[in-house]
Amino acid sequence: MSLFPHVRFLLSVADVIQFPPVEGREVAFAGRSNSGKSSAINAITARNALARVSRTPGRTKLLNFFELAPGQRLIDLPGYGYAEAHAEERRQWTQLIEALPERESLTGLFLIVDIRRGIGEQDVQLMEWAAAAGWQVHVLLAKSDKLNQRDRATAFRIAQEQCGEGVTVQVFSAHDRTGVQAAQKRLIQMLASSSSSS
């Protein structure tokens, strides 16, 4: 049984003025292009086609809002680190992202990282930005099915050391469903809280 049986797409946003009203609780999902973010969203919500999965980096170019339940939203952020993105696209993305801390309804960030690549400089910058905004941060080391058990354990340990205190980390695979229930539980906790100090 899905924990989010009534999840639905709300709208795509290309400009700050298109943001929906600030209400309820929201959690953002972010990650590098091709990190497995869309697959993670689909696995966690138990909806195979909720977020569009593409083999082409940079496919998600807008902020996509989804309603998980009344008063609970998920925000799918554009993937970053896409080398072929035009300057105007990067400027647009930056403008949208920088407006998010003003949303008092936004309480947490799920950061999706390809476990084979590990946490990069842009991931660290995003975590620092989220911490400054007062959000809780949870890191999904996605595509864990691509590594053997020993390499997964090593990647997990390194990620924990990089993230430090205050950031939760887990291994995750949308393919074999490793960590899906743990991610769902963490998402529900974030949606129920009011700040990183809760």
Where are these regions (language model features)?
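Conserved G1/Walker A P-loop phosphate-binding module
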Residues: 1-84
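Canonical P-loop GTPase G-domain recognition
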Residues: 4-16, 146-198
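Switch II of P-loop NTPase G domains
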Residues: 19, 57-64, 78-107, 115-129
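Conserved amphipathic alpha-helical interaction elements at protein-protein interfaces in regulatory
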Residues: 46-50, 132, 189, 193
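Helical mechanochemical/support elements of P-loop NTPase systems and associated helical scaffolds
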Residues: 49, 62, 73, 89-93, ...
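Conserved nucleotide-binding/hydrolysis micro-motifs of P-loop NTPases
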Residues: 59, 72, 79-81, 116-119, ...
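Residue-level signal for inorganic ion chemistry
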Residues: 66, 142, 183
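Conserved C-terminal guanine-recognition region of P-loop GTPase G domains, centered on the G4
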Residues: 98-167
